[in-house]
């Protein structure tokens, strides 16, 4: 959170979502000073019970050491919403987004749902500030789902940021090379796309991040 300093997400993923295994990765990451932006897990189990269990453990660690960060489990937005309604602690609600209505429908969402999630987080979440949404994007996702309407992937990515800005996000990460990796030929194109996304995000006026991911 310091001026001129990059913040990062700590991502203590585990192949079975075992709470003890997650905590081992989480504590190791904290020793490196990682996680000042968010403690965020990609779950294997997208159930409400599993999401709530992980969030409870995250909150326990955060409270025990009074860590000034945010917690989030990157399940589908509807799963997170139900977990929050059932009392799960949560600072940020996550969702992958696209740059077209058809692309977002492929992700199982629309603007109304995202606003509903935002209002729920503001009302029942633990965040102290007004920025309670965490989005991930990435060039090529709309092309993968035939949802780009003939536009190139940079245009579609720029549209993601306009959509995201409406919801006053805490963080927008371009996960370049993850969704739609078949549309990035090699590492040079991944770097190019990451730089394009970073500058587009900054010009749009959103808190922009970049997730280094290369899956093709």
Each model region followed by its residue ranges:
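A cross-domain feature marking catalytic cores of carbohydrate-active enzymes
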Residues: 10-12, 41, 69-75, 96-97, ...
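Residues forming well-ordered secondary-structure scaffolds
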Residues: 3, 20-24, 49, 53
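Conserved structured catalytic cores and adjacent interaction surfaces
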Residues: 214-216
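A cross-kingdom feature marking charged/low-complexity
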Residues: 57-76
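N-terminal amphipathic alpha-helix/helix-capping segment at the start of soluble metabolic enzymes
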Residues: 1-9, 15
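Alpha/beta enzyme core
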Residues: 20-36, 60-63, 78-207
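Glycine-rich, proline-tolerant flexible connector loops at the mouths of alpha/beta enzymes
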Residues: 37-55, 176-185
């Amino acid at each position: 959170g310091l001026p001129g300093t990059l913040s990062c997400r700590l991502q203590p993923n585990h192949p079975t979502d075992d709470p003890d295994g997650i905590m081992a990765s989480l504590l190791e990451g904290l020793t490196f000073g990682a996680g000042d932006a968010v403690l965020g897990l990609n779950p294997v189990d997208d159930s409400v019970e599993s999401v709530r269990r992980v969030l409870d453990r995250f909150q326990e660690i955060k409270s025990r050491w009074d860590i000034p960060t945010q917690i989030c489990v990157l399940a589908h937005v509807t799963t997170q919403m139900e977990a929050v309604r059932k009392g799960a602690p949560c600072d940020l609600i996550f969702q992958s987004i696209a740059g077209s209505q058809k692309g977002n429908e492929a992700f199982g969402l629309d603007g109304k749902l995202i606003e509903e999630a935002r209002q729920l987080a503001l009302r029942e979440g633990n965040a102290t500030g007004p920025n309670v949404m965490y989005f991930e994007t990435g060039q090529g996702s709309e092309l993968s789902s035939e949802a780009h309407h003939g536009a190139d992937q940079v245009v579609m990515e720029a549209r993601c940021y306009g959509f995201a800005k409406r919801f006053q996000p805490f963080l927008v990460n371009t996960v370049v090379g993850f969704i739609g990796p078949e549309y990035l030929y090699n590492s040079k194109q991944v770097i190019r796309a990451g730089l394009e996304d970073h500058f587009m995000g900054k010009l749009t006026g959103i808190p922009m991040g970049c997730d280094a991911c290369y899956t093709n």
